[in-house]
Structures are given as C-alpha cells and as structure tokens.
C-alpha cells in the first residue's frame, strides 16, 4: 500500500491498453460500460496477471514485468479508481468478487493457464479470482495478502481490532473529505512512523489522492466470509505466501491462520523488508516470484532500498 509511482516512458512491449466491460452502477443487474485499464508486456507463454496493493497502481509491477516478459504474457491491471479504470460507485458496497471480476475482465480472450500475483489488497483480490477460476489458475503468489476478516473468524481479536482501528480512521476522515489526515495515518501505519513527515508537499498531495479508492476497499476485505479452510480447498496447491516476520500484527496473524489451514502451500519469510517490500525491495521479492512462477533464472539487478518522501 503506497502512492502510485511517477509516470515512466513505455517500451514498445509494455503498453497501456484498455477493455470495454460492465460496471455495477446502482443496483443488481444495472450496468454501464467502462474501461478496465492495464499495462501489458510479453506476447507468448502462460498469462500472468499482477494485482497491485491499495494506494498504488499497476505501475508498481514495472520491474517485475520486465523480468517476466520474455517467457509470459503479463498484464498488470488497475483496480477500481486507479489509473484510467473508473472509481467505484459510492452508492454501492464493494466486494472482493467485484474486484475479482474486474481482473477477470482484463484477461486476454484466449487465455488458457493463468498465474496470479497479488500484493496486500491485491492478494485478497487474487485469492477471490483464483477461487472463481479454479480450473484455470495454476499458480498463485500472495505478497502479504490482507483478508482481515479472517482475524475475526479465527478469534485473533487484538489483530482484528488493530485493523479495524485503521479502517475506521480512513472511513471517518475520508467521509469528511479530510484525506490528508487519513493519509498520514495510513502512510505511517504501513510504511513506518514518520513516513508522512518525511514526504514532500507534492508527494503528500499525490498520496492523499491515491488513498481515495481505499475507502471502498475496506468493505471488500472486511465483509468477505470464506473460511480459511475453504481457501485451502479452493486455491491451487501451487500457492506461495511471502511475509516479513516482523510486519504489522494483522498481517502476521493472517499469515499464521493461512499456514495452519493451507498446509500444501509454500511459505517464504523475508525479514526486515516491511509490508511494502514489492515496491521498496524488488531486488529481494522479484526473484522469489520469478522462481515460483517457473521462469528461467535471470540476473536481477539489485537496487538500493527506496523510501517514500
């Protein structure tokens, strides 16, 4: 969960495209057309769909796309309210199924075997999509996935209360239009205390604007009901869950719940990288993803850790 990356020049094989689909507007079966925005790279091989975290966007995957494009058809989709994908309609409560259908709509029409990669909220969306397409999704990578509702189901009430506190704060100040206040809390929670204070003025403006879709995303991750054991039956055995053992309490507890219920999965711990590692430490996270998806080992340049601000 972080602010969207700055605009970058597009290479010929990493272009911005869109697809006409349907959007839930003001009630069941009331749809209007809209465009699903995504970036793509590569032209052959299995389809890899990349699903970004909150307050980010499809551009967060640009380095990973570069490492995958020679062997996969890669699409990084913008969820509701990101990039050129329209915002979620305020009168409707968002669900994980809504976001999963959006990603499904962005699939190439001739897609066969599908691999999914999701970070944080994108991980929860990827889980839901994999459950919708069990015969087609062959591999799933979850980077600190955030289905917070599992905490309440499992009785992890301290962790659930911590997540609810953040949720309530975003809902309260978002409803008041005080997005800078909400953004400060959000940034410091996920990126560490003092993150907001270190941001430039322009970065604060961008972060506050990018936070707005998260107002609706909380409904999706809090109102889901699928039990942890059911995820074990619905999702592919070839699932990788990556977590920093020192990450925030709710994510640590979610990881523990899934470890206990989904024993056939692979688990990787990357100490000291934090929740935002896919953006701040791609040198450590991307090789894990590339390896698990079955791509040939490539020399992935290690880059220094970046920081918000």
Feature annotation, model-predicted:
Residues 34-89, 112:
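Conserved HGGG/HGGXW glycine-rich cap/lid loop of the alpha/beta-hydrolase fold
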Residues 78, 115, 138-141:
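Residue in the alpha/beta-hydrolase core beta-strand immediately N-terminal to the catalytic nucleophile
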Residues 97-114:
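Conserved acidic catalytic loop of the alpha/beta-hydrolase fold
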Residues 118, 122, 126:
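Gly/Ala-rich beta-loop-alpha elbow adjacent to hydrolase catalytic centers
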Residues 127, 131-132, 137-174:
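Flexible "cap/lid" loop of the alpha/beta hydrolase fold
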Residues 175-218:
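Conserved alpha/beta-hydrolase catalytic His-Asp/Glu region
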Residues 203-260, 266-269:
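Conserved serine/cysteine hydrolase catalytic core
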Residues 264-309:
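Catalytic active-site module of serine/aspartate enzymes centered on a nucleophile-bearing elbow/loop
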